[in-house]
């Protein structure tokens, strides 16, 4: 059971929980879509980052949208996922992250890509922490299908724009 009742707005239960503050919800999801489907890093890499931290944070809704697929990770994706997990695990002391973490990232990523990865990881941690805090239930089958369709359309648009 969620800590608060979902707002009477359209969308999935996560959107409905944020829907108590419509202006924030609209901007949050616009930022999500912009970062997810635009930028230097692929939407597929970003999705693996999202999936990799969902279980650890405890957002049941977020985790129900797809489990990580470590078998599909190339070196860049594996490094991105490891970085996001390291950021999450050390969130209480981000100053304490060893410089070696960034040295390894720089073997595969440009500075601009590291910035994008850092912002994406922290944005996902924040959103998923909200889901965990509100104890949002797992997605329904229809919500999962809608999420998959939304991702597929966004990824296709990103490919067409490239």
Segments predicted by a language model, with ranges:
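Hydrophobic alpha-helical segments
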Residues: 1-162
